[in-house]
């Protein structure tokens, strides 16, 4: 069967299942099953060629059925891109989002602007390790301390540390993972008053705002989604309190939050003891993260 027919049929199946980007998802899954790049699929489509062995096409159809049931694309392929990393993901770990790349960039820009050498960085609510592993691989000499509450999720963090260290061997001794409650004052207490920057993407979804997308609602771990209160700010506020003790004078907290929470969290940060606090925007112009100076 020509690849054009394969993609057309697959796109139709995904479209009927309510997938927003059926053709893209079909092409990406075929590339994954056939062990080629997405551009190879596009080229085969352009040239009207065949692609994939019988066995590979069987794998593709199985992946397609999973996607039609609204399983996240990244869980099916087993990995998710984040900045310069390709992170392993699967059921039980939060899939890193593009908007979090903006949060990381804000932190890295601050480190660069202030000429930080060998900065001490903390990633609270580490999940897949996206934030901390990005920092430790992009900022030479940085020491990153990551905290994750779930032992199961921490296994994904360790996997991604192992994979990232293959590309950046020096980071193995610069990344430290603790399985603990990120909001507890006992967690990383030995670092209190010494941290240059805390970059974090805590659970913040309001309990009144259950996600409509099945990929999020039915698959992302609830522990990584909901902020512990009706408006979703309970856990973010506890993270602010913890970060305030961790940071040295002049240190910075960069924390992702819901688009509805900016003003409240800025006010809370100032009331907690931060000298300055403001809201940063993501690439769509929406209020997306707190930037607070100790």
From Swiss-Prot:
GO molecular function: nucleic acid binding; protein-(glutamine-N5) methyltransferase activity; protein-glutamine N-methyltransferase activity
Gene3D superfamilies: DNA helicase RuvA subunit, C-terminal domain, Vaccinia Virus protein VP39
UniProt keyword terms in alphabetical order: Methyltransferase, S-adenosyl-L-methionine, Transferase
Top-level enzyme category: transferase
Residues that hold substrate according to the record: 201-204
A Gene Ontology BP annotation from the UniProt entry: methylation
Keyword Methyltransferase in annotation: yes
Top-level taxonomic group: Bacteria
Binding site for S-adenosyl-L-methionine: 148, 201
Keyword Metal-binding: no
Pfam families assigned: Cons_hypoth95, PrmC_N
EC annotation from Swiss-Prot or TrEMBL: 2.1.1.297
InterPro entries reported for this sequence: DNA_methylase_N6_adenine_CS, HemK-like, N5-glutamine_MTase, PrmC_N, RF_methyltr_PrmC, SAM-dependent_MTases_sf
Catalytic activity: L-glutaminyl-[peptide chain release factor] + S-adenosyl-L-methionine = N(5)-methyl-L-glutaminyl-[peptide chain release factor] + S-adenosyl-L-homocysteine + H(+)
Family: Belongs to the protein N5-glutamine methyltransferase family. PrmC subfamily.
Function: Methylates the class 1 translation termination release factors RF1/PrfA and RF2/PrfB on the glutamine residue of the universally conserved GGQ motif.
HAMAP family in the record: RF_methyltr_PrmC
Protein name: Release factor glutamine methyltransferase
Name of the gene encoding the protein in the UniProt record: prmC
């Amino acid at each position: 069967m020509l690849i054009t027919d394969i993609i057309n049929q697959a796109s139709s199946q995904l479209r009927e299942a309510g997938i927003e980007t059926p053709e893209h998802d079909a092409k990406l899954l075929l590339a994954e099953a056939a062990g080629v790049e997405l551009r190879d699929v596009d080229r085969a489509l352009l040239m009207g060629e065949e692609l994939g062995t019988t066995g590979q096409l069987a794998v593709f159809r199985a992946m397609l059925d999973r996607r039609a049931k609204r399983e996240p694309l990244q869980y099916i392929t087993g990995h998710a891109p984040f900045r310069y990393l390709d992170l392993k993901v699967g059921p039980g770990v939060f899939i890193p989002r593009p908007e979090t790349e903006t949060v990381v960039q804000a932190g890295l820009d601050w480190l660069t602007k202030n000429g930080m050498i060998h900065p001490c960085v903390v990633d609270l609510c580490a999940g897949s390790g996206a934030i901390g592993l990005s920092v430790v691989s992009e900022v030479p000499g940085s020491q990153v301390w990551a905290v994750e509450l779930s032992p199961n999720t921490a296994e994904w963090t360790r996997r991604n540390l192992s994979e990232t260290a293959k590309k950046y061997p020096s980071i193995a001794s610069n990344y430290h993972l603790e399985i603990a409650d990120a909001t507890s004052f006992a967690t990383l207490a030995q670092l209190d008053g010494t941290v240059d920057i805390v970059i974090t993407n805590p659970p913040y979804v309001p309990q009144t705002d259950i996600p409509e997308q099945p990929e999020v609602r039915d698959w992302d771990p609830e522990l990584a989604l909901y902020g512990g209160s009706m408006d979703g700010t309970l856990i973010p506020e506890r993270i602010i309190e913890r970060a305030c003790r961790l940071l040295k004078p002049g240190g910075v907290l960069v924390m992702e939050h819901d688009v509805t929470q900016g003003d409240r969290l800025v006010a809370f940060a100032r009331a907690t003891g931060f000298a300055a606090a403001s809201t940063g925007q993501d690439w769509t112009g929406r209020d997306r993260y707190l930037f607070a100076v100790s």
